[in-house]
Regions:
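Basic, alpha-helical nucleic-acid-binding regions used in initiation and control of genome expression
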Residues: 1-339
Length: 339
């Protein structure tokens, strides 16, 4: 730590007051990214700041931790809570709060391990809020893949690194300038980001056709559906508990989404019978979990319709899936059902 950083921490210990260098979060900036950037601007590491405040070295912040950090960094606490992934429980199941809503799919948000676009960091200097979406594996601005590991040492990135664009090994982060994502992936990320932000519009002008019913679902549901369609390389491949509950690496998630998009092109119209070879590749448990745990009725109805289309091979009783209510008829029609 620099001498200036040591002095700042000593001051904080003697007189718990906001750090001297203060600034506002950038547009669409991640909460943890802002804390990392603000700590750096004050000459201390984020890890050291957590230590001196008596908080655990963890990106999972409690309500008390949020309040202490918001006061110390002098940022609005409500904004920090909005822009930070906060774990919790609902009906006995783990869930997350982020962007003012509840997320029930355990694979939707990165949380503990960040992913970044080094080109954005070099140009703008801030970690974006959208990068918290585990399925947002590409940068819409530069058309390149995001990274979650250091290209120099190979270690996974953490929120406790020295700066937003520097790994714990001390090297700056970078990405191959020739690496480009496919049109289909750009369309997917655009839709995911648009639905997560509530804008209802994709962040890309791609003409790639996604299933029309993607437009009305939450980003949480889109991630669960993509995982169910893409996690298996082939029919009946075993999916471990860890694979179904822990967000995969960015590279692994990219492969999952690429397979899912290929298979989902055959699911544009769910009124057409499901191909038998496709049915064998879908991991239905993720859809059942979405149907049982999600609070959003549109998302639950979508999961139910897909399960009915697949024939619900898992032995569960398809009759237990209720038909949509009158306010979900438009969605059900989009999915190929009868009103």
């Amino acid at each position: 730590m620099s001498p200036e950083g040591s002095a700042a921490l000593e001051t904080l210990m003697r007189d718990p007051a906001p750090l001297p260098v203060q600034f506002e979060p950038m547009t669409n900036e991640s909460g943890l990214g802002f804390l990392l950037r603000a700590s750096r601007a004050n000459g201390v590491s984020f890890a050291s700041l957590l230590d001196e405040l008596g908080l655990p070295r963890s990106p999972w912040l409690t309500a008390a931790g949020l309040s202490v950090l918001a006061y110390t960094i002098n940022v609005d606490r409500d904004w920090l809570a909005f822009a930070t992934v906060i774990p919790g429980r609902r009906d006995g199941f783990r869930c997350f709060e982020w962007r003012g809503r509840l997320w029930t799919c355990p694979l939707s948000l990165r949380g503990k391990y960040p992913q970044v676009c080094p080109r954005c960091l070099r140009e703008g200097g801030a970690c974006l809020l959208d990068w918290e979406l585990a399925g947002a594996v590409a940068c819409l601005q530069h058309g390149c893949p995001l990274i979650d590991g250091c290209p120099h040492c190979g270690r996974r990135l953490t929120w406790l690194r020295p700066a937003v664009d520097v790994c714990n090994c001390g090297h700056y982060l970078w990405v191959d300038s020739t690496a480009q994502t496919r049109e289909a992936m750009g369309a997917w990320v655009g839709r995911l980001v648009g639905n997560a932000s509530g804008s209802g519009t994709p962040g890309t002008t791609s003409t790639y056709m996604l299933p029309p019913w993607f437009n009305v679902l939450s980003a949480d549901a889109l991630t669960a559906i993509a995982f169910s369609f893409g996690v298996r390389d082939g029919p009946f491949e075993r999916v471990t508990s860890a694979a179904a509950t822990v967000p995969p690496s960015t590279r692994r998630m990219t492969s999952i989404i690429e397979r899912a998009l290929i298979r989902l092109r055959r699911a544009h119209d769910l009124a057409v019978p499901c191909p038998s070879d496709l049915r064998l590749c879908v991991y239905e448990q993720a859809l059942w979990r979405l149907w049982r745990r999600h609070a959003d009725l549109s998302d639950r109805d979508a999961a139910a319709r897909i399960l009915l289309w697949l024939g619900a091979r898992s032995g569960k009783n398809c009759a237990s899936i209720s038909a949509p209510g009158s306010d979900q008829c438009e969605l059900f029609a989009l999915l190929g059902g009868d009103e």
